[in-house]
Curated annotation (Swiss-Prot):
The gene is ribH. Catalyzes the formation of 6,7-dimethyl-8-ribityllumazine by condensation of 5-amino-6-(D-ribitylamino)uracil with 3,4-dihydroxy-2-butanone 4-phosphate. This is the penultimate step in the biosynthesis of riboflavin. Keywords: Riboflavin biosynthesis, Transferase. Pathway: Cofactor biosynthesis; riboflavin biosynthesis; riboflavin from 2-hydroxy-3-oxobutyl phosphate and 5-amino-6-(D-ribitylamino)uracil: step 1/2. Coiled coil: none annotated. InterPro entries: LS, LS/RS, LS/RS_sf. 5-amino-6-(D-ribitylamino)uracil binds at residues 30, 64-66, 88-90, 121. It comes from Albidiferax ferrireducens (strain ATCC BAA-621 / DSM 15236 / T118). (2S)-2-hydroxy-3-oxobutyl phosphate binds at residues 93-94, 135. This is 6,7-dimethyl-8-ribityllumazine synthase. Belongs to the DMRL synthase family. One of its GO terms (biological process) is riboflavin biosynthetic process.
Length: 157
């Protein structure tokens, strides 16, 4: 079985140098205790990777389905090197979970491809609150690292 950290870079790797980058974060407020922790962990990691605080913008939207339209608005500004989608969808008793998870994920991917901008997707999709709590900090940090690495990669291509 593969370790969850397989494929991660050392913090000293130049691909994780965020000093010249501008990053936008879109946070869904639904399940806010989880999404607050995700966003805080993401921002803390961006700062640790050298992204200046003044170059990190955070906008909030009601829920995961609204994340793609806010990402689109940020992408259209052409001011960001990468974006991060933050949200939390916890399975309930209805089909709504699948709808929200699938549509928000597809929307995030569409914006990334249409605007050729890296978007780290930290919209958690979990079976229960305990799974979300267990992942909230690590996935926020992971999203920051993905955003910085992909922004640097695209600038080098």
């Amino acid at each position: 079985m593969l370790d969850a950290n397989q494929g991660t870079l050392a913090a000293s790797d130049s691909r994780l140098n965020g000093k010249k980058l501008r990053i936008g974060i879109v946070q869904a407020r639904f399940n806010e205790p989880i999404t607050n922790t995700l966003a805080q962990a993401c921002k803390a990691e961006l700062l640790a990777l050298g992204v200046a605080e003044k170059h990190i913008d955070l906008v909030q939207v009601p829920g995961a389905l609204e994340v793609p339209v806010a990402l689109l608005a940020l992408a259209e500004k052409l001011e960001y090197d990468a974006l991060v989608a933050v949200g939390c969808i916890i399975r309930g008793e209805t089909y709504h979970f699948e709808l929200v998870a699938n549509e928000s994920g597809a929307g995030v991917s569409r914006v990334a491809l249409d605007y050729q901008i890296p978007i780290a997707n930290a919209i958690l999709t979990t079976e229960n609150l305990a799974q979300a709590i267990a992942r909230q900090t690590e996935k926020g940090r992971d999203a920051a690292r993905v955003a910085v690495e992909m922004a640097n990669l695209l600038s080098d291509i």
